[in-house]
């Protein structure tokens, strides 16, 4: 029997993005070490959106050091995630409200895991657009993860080892993408890998326009708030 996962999705999460990135880093470390840890849930509540909120303006954000470059996929530091994270979405993400102990939908509204744990199928939300107006499709998911899993020459991908079992990425239709594994991995490990805060989804067209290297590209479009 195929295992299917789905949950309610909310866009009110600019604060949650930063917390989710930290939770994602924690989750992957936990999965690699195999040592169970318990974190207390943060004592905070997200504010309800203002009914007549002002659009535009400038957000100033203080960090300890400037990012060495702007390519999140080639980064492993919070300096990139803290400044860029809110501009992008992930396929799935860790829930910032429980310190990342659960996985929740992001661009994927639901997913299925085959009984043998060797096929992961993600079903995307429809109507999502990049900041430049381009429509999000499964081709963008494939292009993003192909770059992370099988990096081109000269590309540094810190999270490639997490996906060593992935043998193929198949686009079934505009809103369905499938990851095939040549051998099973623990489901919580694989879902944690997909949910890493640095695995943001980038438009395929953007990658092609910049020869799959975004280190010096400051403002490539995302789908985040």
Where are these regions (language model features)?
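N-terminal secretory signal peptides
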Residues: 1-13, 22, 32, 36-37
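C-terminal segment of N-terminal export signals and the immediately downstream linker at the start
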Residues: 30-60
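N-terminal lobe/hinge region of extracytoplasmic solute-binding protein
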Residues: 44, 62-115, 146, 223-225
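Short, well-ordered beta-strand elements
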Residues: 56-65, 119-121, 178
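Short, solvent-exposed loop/turn and secondary-structure capping segments
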Residues: 71-74, 134, 189-193
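Extracytoplasmic/secreted proteins, especially bacterial periplasmic and envelope-associated proteins
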Residues: 86, 106, 136, 140-144, ...
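Aromatic- and charge-enriched surface segment that lines or borders ligand/interaction sites
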Residues: 110-154, 172, 178-183, 188-189
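Surface-exposed binding/hinge segments that line
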Residues: 159-219
């Amino acid at each position: 029997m195929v295992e299917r996962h789905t949950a309610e999705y909310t866009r009110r999460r600019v604060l949650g993005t930063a917390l989710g990135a930290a939770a994602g880093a924690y989750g992957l470390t936990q999965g690699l070490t195999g040592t169970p840890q318990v974190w207390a849930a943060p004592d905070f509540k997200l504010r309800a959106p203002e009914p007549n909120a002002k659009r535009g303006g400038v957000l100033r954000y203080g960090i300890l050091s400037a990012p060495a470059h702007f390519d999140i996929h080639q980064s492993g530091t919070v300096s990139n995630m803290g400044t860029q994270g809110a501009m992008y979405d992930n396929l799935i993400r860790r829930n910032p409200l429980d310190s990342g102990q659960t996985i929740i939908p992001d661009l994927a509204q639901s997913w299925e895991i085959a009984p043998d744990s060797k096929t992961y199928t993600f079903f995307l939300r429809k109507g999502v657009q990049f900041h430049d107006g381009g429509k999000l499709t499964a081709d963008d998911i494939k292009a993003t993860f192909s770059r992370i899993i099988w990096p081109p020459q000269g590309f540094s991908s810190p999270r490639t080892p997490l996906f060593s079992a992935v043998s193929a990425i198949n686009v079934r239709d505009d809103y369905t993408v499938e990851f095939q594994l040549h051998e099973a991995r623990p489901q919580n490990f694989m879902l944690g890998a997909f949910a890493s805060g640095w695995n943001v989804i980038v438009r395929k067209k953007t990658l092609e326009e910049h020869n799959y290297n975004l280190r010096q590209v400051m403002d490539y479009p995302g789908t985040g708030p």
